[in-house]
């Protein structure tokens, strides 16, 4: 709700810098202050489109209190492996709910493998050097010798990482960021009931 409105600038910064970030949104009734103690799934469109410019990001919704751990883990995996902010939607019922939950073993979860730079990249590293298959830029952690670079909210040149206002470069970078997000695998949609002769389709999330 209003909290996510105030965070949209930081979310947009994570989009253009291509840094991992998980934003947890506990939805409530709106608009404005609205219904601050009541539950409502009001922020889906805001999570998808509520930023300026071309700034796509994945959105995940938790379905129950016990599902929150799995959803948060997958949101973190997507953010870290694809160098993108991810929004995790919950709501008042989920946030205030409870349920029996067995502490999982991390070995049962898929590994998280961030796209860190490698030593052989040092000679030709640029901040937006990308994996040719996934489109994800490689991640140089601050302090790594030989990988000094500058990030920020200004558009950068796709090759050098320097500030650029060139329209062709900006168009390219917008497409590269969008294509990277579009390549993130999405699970198959689960259809319950017989879909062959149905007159009405109900789509739910969370």
Which residues are covered by each model-predicted region?
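Short, flexible turn/loop "capping" segments at secondary-structure junctions
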Residues: 49-53, 194-195
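Flexible, active-site-adjacent loop/turn segments at secondary-structure boundaries
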Residues: 2-4, 42-45, 57-58, 92, ...
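Short C-terminal domain-edge/linker segments immediately following a structured domain
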Residues: 27-30, 52-57, 90-92, 117-122
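Thiamine diphosphate
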Residues: 1-49, 58-80
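Flexible, low-complexity linker and terminal segments
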Residues: 71, 76-206
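Glycine- and acidic
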Residues: 54-61, 197-200
